[in-house]
Amino acid sequence: MLQLVKVSGKSLLPEYREGDFVLVTKIPFFLRHIRQGDIIVFDHPVYGLMIKRVEHLIPERDEIYVIGTPEFSVDSRTFGPISWKVLVGKVIWHIQIPR
């Protein structure tokens, strides 16, 4: 019910850097309580495994809008909302790698 995921890319700089790790929970209780500002991991059908911040939720339409920190981030501004079905889990712990 937990998964360790390595951060790849720059979508949540400076908080989450390439090479860091995040512990993701797949426990349904936590997934039902996702809210704006949470960090989630999802498996996008085109872009693959992604980590983003929740910008907006519309549960009755099965929509989660996600956003990255930099303006150039590929996120819901590019591909629209994601479905709850592609959600891998919610980040519950961030492991920063010393630089």
What is the predicted role of each segment?
Residues M1-R99:
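Extended hydrophobic leader/signal-anchor segments used for secretion and membrane insertion
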